[in-house]
């Protein structure tokens, strides 16, 4: 989960600066295809889930992997919810960009490939994920759903330049900077 203010749009060709969250030595990246809903609903069918998607985006889900609770478990709130932890590309309307199956995702750090994979390797397709989510809560127009990441998530450092994309959808660039 992310809060709305964690999401930030990255214009194509620009580089977004992301401050290293305080108190971490283990900031990680996850490239993901993002489904952007134009319609909501509850208990959607597969066909309704497909029709609910207004567009597609590229997203990076940043996670602080070393935030612990006093009891020893991972603090999921501080791990996932921090400034600019969910950069996304501008949305490509689904009617102009039909989602091929499968879709390839990739992420480079300092020009070295860290993640590469396909939506065919996800446990549930993006559409099936929307169906499943709608069983548990009402989806709303404007919701964005990060749909999963390939293997290869790794630790980032200040100064790292990340170039990530989803074939047919777009790409984004971000740089990890000192926290002011």
Where are the model-predicted features located?
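Short, conserved beta-strand element in jelly-roll/cupin
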Residues: 1, 34-39, 88, 130-131
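Extended, compositionally biased flexible segments
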Residues: 1-31
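Short beta-strand-to-turn element immediately C-terminal to the catalytic PLP-Schiff-base lysine
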Residues: 1-2, 10, 21, 36-38, ...
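Structural motif
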Residues: 6-7, 17, 32-34, 55-57, ...
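A short secondary-structure junction signal
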Residues: 12-15, 22, 44-49, 67-72, ...
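A generic local secondary-structure boundary/capping motif
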Residues: 15-27, 41-48, 76-80, 93-96, ...
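Catalytic-pocket segment enriched in acidic/His residues
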Residues: 63-180
């Amino acid at each position: 989960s992310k809060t709305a203010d964690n999401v930030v749009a990255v214009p194509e060709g620009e580089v977004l600066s992301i401050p290293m969250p305080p108190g971490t030595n283990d900031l990680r990246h996850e490239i993901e295809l993002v489904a952007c809903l134009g319609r909501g609903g509850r208990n959607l069918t597969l066909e309704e889930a497909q029709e609910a998607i207004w567009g597609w985006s590229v997203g990076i889900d940043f996670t602080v992997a070393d935030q612990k609770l006093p009891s020893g478990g991972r603090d999921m709130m501080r791990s996932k919810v921090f400034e600019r932890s969910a950069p996304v590309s501008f949305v490509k309307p689904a009617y102009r960009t039909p989602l091929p199956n499968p879709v390839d995702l990739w992420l480079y750090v300092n020009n070295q490939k860290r993640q590469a994979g396909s939506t065919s390797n996800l446990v549930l397709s993006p559409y099936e994920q929307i169906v499943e989510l709608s069983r548990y809560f009402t989806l709303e127009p404007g919701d964005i759903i990060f749909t999963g990441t390939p293997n290869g998530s790794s630790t980032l450092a200040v100064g790292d330049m990340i170039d990530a994309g989803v074939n047919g959808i777009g790409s984004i660039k971000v740089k990890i900077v000192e926290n002011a």
